[in-house]
């Protein structure tokens, strides 16, 4: 379903913005309370683990965010890869967020 694609979600939420700028800004707003879980990459097991987050936009739109942070280059610079940023296929529930304060 197109609604659950990265492109559709970014275009819907940030229609008047450069998508790269919008995603960079949104990543900077993530907090430990948005954290859901850490997952291994089954397809690329030698890569670093991925972190899953969830945020609610416009009061009702659950958005699933998955990132991978890797050390690249000889100076150990970190690069963040956005693996997923799309409307959640299942509604978020409180137990999905281990560090969320009520």
Describe every region a protein language model picked out.
Residues 62-63, 68-102:
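Enriched for short, Lys/Arg-rich terminal
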Residues 29-77:
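Functional cores of ribonucleases/endoribonucleases
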Residues 1-47:
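Compact soluble domain cores
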């Amino acid at each position: 379903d197109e609604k659950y694609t990265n492109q559709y979600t970014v275009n819907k939420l940030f229609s008047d913005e450069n998508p790269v700028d919008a995603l960079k800004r949104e990543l900077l707003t993530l907090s430990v309370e948005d954290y859901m879980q850490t997952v291994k990459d089954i397809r690329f097991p030698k890569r670093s683990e991925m972190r899953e987050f969830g945020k609610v936009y416009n009061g009702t739109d659950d958005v699933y965010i998955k990132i991978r942070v890797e050390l690249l280059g000889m100076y150990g610079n970190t690069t963040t890869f956005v693996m997923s940023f799309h409307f959640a296929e299942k509604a978020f529930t409180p137990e999905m967020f281990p560090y969320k304060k009520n």
